[in-house]
Amino acid sequence: MAQSMLVSGANGTVAAASTSRLQPVRPTPFSRLVLSQPSSSLGRAVSVKTVALFGRSKTKAAPARKAEPKPKFKTEDGIFGTSGGIGFTKENELFVGRVAMLGFAASILGEAITGKGILAQLNLETGIPIYEAEPLLLFFILFTLLGAIGALGDRGSFVDDQPVTGLDKAVIAPGKGFRSALGLSEGGPLFGFTKANELFVGRLAQLGIAFSIIGEIITGKGALAQLNIETGVPINEIEPLVLFNVVFFFIAAINPGTGKFVSDDDEE
């Protein structure tokens, strides 16, 4: 009896093991395959989208760049550092230069006609040592020399106008005149003389007046006589070079010039 029970138990164990081995070999039903794949792929897609959404939210915006400040015009302090003290700007120096050009042209023309230098025309004593000259005259010479070399300080700057180039300058537009055909500006000055050029010519005139006065104080001769140019003649017999200088300085003084003055305060 006991042997039969052991044999039946062993047979049951063997049968259970064989059934467990056969189950994995069985094919999976088609319905289970069809229904299980979309759910897994859908879950993966949803999980990927969720990660993508959370990933976008974590991105940081790039910091905005600050606008770079515009470069300021350099302030010229001069020899004595008086740029911020007396407020001598390039615009003031341009005015002084225009006055110097008019004065220099008038003194040359007057000496060519009368034969007298600029000091002799004003009935001032000449032909004396420089230290015996009038104090006001010496101050004028010193001020003119310092202004001519820019020692008083010249704040600000002259900015030239943008030149017109291309077809707008090469072709005569309808309604324009003869100046456009020659390449000249229609509404501006004729010679295109800028304020920066006029400032340079004004400094030359200041130097010319200062040295001609110094020479006349010491020698008693005017600017033309110091250069051995004939003076005291009618205007139609004056040297052509002298007349050219007179006309040049006169036109340069009254010419408005192109460009504009920009100060340090405007730039700030």
Swiss-Prot record:
InterPro entries: Chloroa_b-bind. The chain crosses the membrane at residues 99-119, 133-153, 199-219, 234-254. It comes from Oryza sativa subsp. japonica. Sequence repeats lie at residues 54-161, 164-268. One of its GO terms (cellular component) is photosystem II. This is Photosystem II 22 kDa protein 1, chloroplastic. PANTHER family: UPF0041 BRAIN PROTEIN 44-RELATED. Keywords: Chloroplast, Membrane, Photosynthesis, Photosystem II, Plastid, Repeat, Thylakoid, Transit peptide, Transmembrane, Transmembrane helix. It is found in: Plastid, Chloroplast thylakoid membrane. Disruption phenotype: Impaired energy-dependent nonphotochemical quenching (NPQ, qE) in high light conditions leading to an increased susceptibility to photoinhibition. Reduced seeds production. Reduced photosynthetic CO(2) assimilation in high light intensity. Accumulation of superoxide and hydrogen peroxide in chloroplasts. Accelerated cyclic electron flow (CEF) due to an alternate PGR5-dependent CEF pathway conferring a photoprotection of photosystems in the absence of energy-dependent quenching (qE). Residues 1-60 form a transit peptide. Expressed in leaves (at protein level).
